[in-house]
A protein has these predicted regions:
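Bacterial N-terminal signal peptides
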Residues: 11-31
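C-terminal cap of metal-dependent C-N hydrolases
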Residues: 357, 444-451, 456, 527-573
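Active-site neighborhoods of metal-dependent hydrolases
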Residues: 172-175, 180-207, 211-234, 249, ...
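Divalent metal-binding pocket/active-site signature
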Residues: 219-276
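Histidine-rich, glycine-flanked metal-binding segment
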Residues: 35-44, 50-104, 119
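Metal-associated gating/positioning segment near the N- to mid-region
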Residues: 93-163
Length: 591
């Protein structure tokens, strides 16, 4: 795949340099691939195939680093550049002949919020070449009031984490102080904001509540948030109105941020949900992105073409609309995505208590079987398409890896009753993989120039307490799968296009001007991999399995993977959005 938009990009560095070049005699013009103000070089990556993240063709050459920044990317076919580079002494040289040198990969949908506190190396992602985790799908790690902190603590203590922070800025500060192996960015969660102001109310906000919500978005933007993220199929987020979301997105846009959303529907009402996102972008002035773009359920697969048409039309009108995806046909969520929202109101305790009532249970079962529900039901394609990934309760671990149909048969109950039993016994911690997408649609999405990649997973290690829970393979394999299966093995897209879609594209969508490219002055976030060997190895049966083929990964110029092995280094930084005002004094009440 080589669309006009992908093949004809003019490098931004060259564009910026044109006035200078045109003003100088040809003999005095400076090479655009070099930071001429830098007089030192700490590392030379020598002889690799450089794919710079722009979508332009790669070249054999050298990438020179000075500490945490890139000094130059030199094409060996350019005698002048080679001569300049050879004249610059580098303290260290690493021979990377036969390997691809690319910008570090950007995970546009990361749930490493808690796993990075347990193990700051983020190895499942780093082993694939990921150098930036972008969090905040609906829920973010602040701002919190005490009830929210208590709920998070109840959940997180199961994973060995006791949250002490209140704001997103506090969370950033804690990560920075503790040390992290990858860079971290985050949107502020629209659900988190809503619960802070309104609790779990099922109505839209009044004028004063909306003003408070906007002020919290403003504070989060000043703390470094990338914008506002929503997840509209889950309670209580599903009660957010379009007006409410547009107002929050507008506040983010005033600070240079964007809006990103798990759509209100990915199945029966998919087209309406896409139009809502486009409307929010148009009304707010915010660029907008769709989380894990999909047409879920066999009956809805044909809708993807209409979605693509709608987004293409919106983009032609000047709106900045994009999407991300993961390269698997199975989604993953909880059993809350298989039950009507009303039964979940008020949180886990009330949800469980309601399900224990025989009359409520009967009503829930009937609605779970309704082929045309007015809510998003990921079980519509059948219990044989829903596989148990993980539970908290030890007594239930014997079911991990089984489908809901198999669990129901083993327990002698219906699949709907089995799901209800799991929620009651595990108190909603149950994780399910739902096979709801088509391979043909997956390939079609990969070829769209405005689609990037997000794992929609945490970043565990294949060791310790992480082994108690199975994982969706996307946690260990999303990026390697794109480069191995869909680029090398099946030629669905070209290497330069794929690298652009996991580096330069998401960086541009985030408004980053110094990451996502191999260019002078950019941060030295780099992935060095063997294009002939890179591949995902994680499966549903053996999920804790690292990807293969990545030899070296640099985060801010420091190696976190060297010769295919983790170094233990923690050089990650907080990547803050354009509204950041440095050290922000918290204005959040301590209630």
């Amino acid at each position: 795949m080589k669309s006009v938009a992908l093949c004809c990009r003019f490098p931004e560095v060259l564009i910026a340099a044109l006035p200078l070049l045109l003003a100088l005699p040809l003999s005095l013009a400076l090479p655009v691939w070099a930071d001429t103000e830098s007089g030192s070089c700490t590392l030379r990556l020598s002889g690799g195939w450089v794919v710079d993240g722009s979508g332009e063709p790669g070249f054999q050459g050298d990438v020179l680093l000075d500490g945490e920044r890139i000094v130059a990317a030199i094409d060996r076919a350019d005698p002048r550049g080679t001569a300049w580079g050879n004249g610059l002494h580098c303290a260290h040289t690493r021979d990377v002949r036969g390997l691809v040198v690319a910008p570090g990969f950007i995970n546009m949908l990361s749930w490493a919020t808690e796993s990075i506190l347990l193990d700051p190396r983020a190895l499942s992602d780093v082993a694939q070449g990921v150098t930036l985790e972008v969090m905040g799908e609906g829920r973010s790690m602040g701002p919190f009031v005490n009830p929210q902190r208590a709920n998070l603590r109840a959940s997180a203590i199961d994973a060995g984490v006791a949250p002490q922070w209140r704001t997103l800025g506090d969370y950033f500060g804690m990560l920075r102080q503790a040390g992290i192996g990858v860079n971290v960015a985050s949107y502020v969660g629209a659900t988190t904001i809503r619960e802070y102001v309104m609790g779990r109310k099922t109505r839209g906000p009044n004028e004063s509540e909306l003003a408070k919500m906007r002020s919290l978005v403003r504070q989060a933007m000043e703390e470094g948030a990338m914008g506002v993220g929503s997840s509209l199929i889950y309670t209580p987020a599903n009660y957010a109105t379009t007006d409410e979301l547009a107002a929050l997105a507008a506040e983010a846009a005033q600070h240079g941020g964007g809006y990103i959303s798990h759509l209100r529907s990915e199945s029966q009402h998919l087209l309406d949900a896409v139009e809502e996102l486009i409307e929010i972008s148009e009304r707010s002035g915010a660029r907008a992105e769709i989380y894990h773009l999909k047409a879920a359920g066999n009956a809805n697969w044909s809708k993807l073409n209409q979605v693509i048409d709608a987004i293409t039309t919106a983009r032609s009108r000047g709106l900045e609309i994009s999407a991300n995806m993961y390269p698997y046909t199975a989604a993953a969520s909880g059993l809350d995505a298989a039950m009507p929202p009303w039964v979940q109101l008020g949180g886990v305790d009330l949800w469980v208590e309601r399900l224990k009532d025989p009359q409520v249970r009967q009503k829930v079962v009937a609605q779970m079987r309704d082929p045309h529900p007015d809510w998003e039901n990921l079980l519509l394609d059948g219990a044989d398409k829903a596989r148990l990934l993980g539970v908290k309760t030890k007594a239930l671990r014997r079911y991990v890896g089984m489908t809901l149909a198999e669990i129901a048969a083993a327990r002698g109950v219906s699949p709907e009753d089995a799901a209800i039993d799991l929620v009651i016994a595990d108190r909603s911690k149950t994780r399910i993989a739902y096979s709801v997408m088509s391979e043909a649609n997956l390939r079609k999405k990969l070829q769209l120039e405005w689609v990037s990649i997000g794992s929609d997973a945490s970043a565990p290690a294949a060791e310790g307490r992480f082994l108690y829970q199975s994982q969706h393979p996307r946690a260990y394999g999303s990026f390697a799968r794109v480069l191995g299966r869909y680029v090398r093995d099946e030629a669905v897209l070209e290497l330069e296009d794929a690298v652009y879609q996991i580096t330069g594209l998401p960086a541009a969508n985030l408004g980053l001007t110094d990451r996502g490219r191999i260019a002078p002055g950019y941060f030295a976030d780099l992935a060095v991999f063997d294009a002939g060997k890179i591949i995902d190895t994680s499966t549903f049966a053996e999920s804790h399995s690292y990807a293969k083929g990545v030899q070296h990964v640099y985060v801010n110029g420091k190696p976190v993977i060297a010769d295919g092995k983790p170094t233990g280094a923690l050089p990650g930084q907080i990547v803050r959005g354009p509204g950041w005002k440095g050290s922000v004094q918290t204005a959040i009440s301590q209630r």
